Swiss-Prot record:
GO biological process, one term: embryo development ending in seed dormancy
Transit peptide: 1-13
Name used for this protein in its record: Protein SCO1 homolog 1, mitochondrial
Transmembrane annotation, as ranges: 125-144
Pfam families linked to this entry: SCO1-SenC
Originating species: Arabidopsis thaliana (Mouse-ear cress)
Function in brief: Thought to play a role in cellular copper homeostasis, mitochondrial redox signaling or insertion of copper into the active site of COX. Plays an essential role in embryo development.
Matches recorded under SUPFAM superfamilies: Thioredoxin-like (SSF52833)
This protein's UniProt keywords: Chaperone, Copper, Membrane, Metal-binding, Mitochondrion, Mitochondrion inner membrane, Transit peptide, Transmembrane, Transmembrane helix
Amino acid sequence: MASALCRTASRLRSVQLFRRIRVSSDLLSASSPSPACISDALRHGDFSLPRSFFSLNCGIEMLKMDQRCLLSTSASDTTSKHDSGKPETKSSEKNEKSGGSESSDGGSDHKNERASGKDVRGGPVSWMSFFLLFATGAGLVYYYDTQKKRHIEDINKNSIAVKEGPSAGKAAIGGPFSLIRDDGKRVTEKNLMGKWTILYFGFTHCPDICPDELIKLAAAIDKIKENSGVDVVPVFISVDPERDTVQQVHEYVKEFHPKLIGLTGSPEEIKSVARSYRVYYMKTEEEDSDYLVDHSIVMYLMSPEMNFVKFYGKNHDVDSLTDGVVKEIRQYRK
């Protein structure tokens, strides 16, 4: 807009200048003195110039002034054009820069969107986090699995030590005792040394469990002899000393096996041997003033040195009891 106004002003000045030049030329042609007039003036010494000459002089001066104005106007137009061109260049550069920045911003936004998209889909950071999580989980699973296996192995080793180790057996179960045999003789653990022995704790008034266990023991004794050729001594120890006299025990054991030895004693002696072999027993009162004895149902296999080897519960039948004892005897011989 400014450049258009400058061009219009310069055109108007040029038109005015052209008109002034025409007027000045007309004046010069109309009122210029002739050579005769000039020579007469010189002869008479009249140096006064005619009025037209002054008009011409004024016209020339005005022409110079208009020319300077024209030059200054053209210069100002050029300067204004140059100045107006610079802001456009700068503005264009700014626009280019802003466009570049916008494009760079757009690129950065695109990168950000891609980065955010990678995070959602699983970029490098997410995969690394997943890998660390997986490695940690696998390590924990491996650690707990290893600890579990180690714990199971320790339990198995301890079980084997309790079942097979003589030192562990002596410390846990067994010990010296002094009781009365069913033939009336007092015996100790030393009288049973030299042979394999199976001890069972019960009482003669037991209605069902004790008879069943003693029948199983008697059958196993014979089968052990057949399978291994080893004579195992079966021993019955009463936990009811108040009622189980020597005679009562003698009659009771002979009902199951001829080799079965019956032992009894005073309440203190029975209590001591039961404590040594970790046997539980307790009287239970009945309505008819009679009582039963609640006790542990366990058979103890003792080595020829009267060291504890292994125990067998009620869950073992004749065959499993026989196989277990034969296995322990063969392992002992090795």
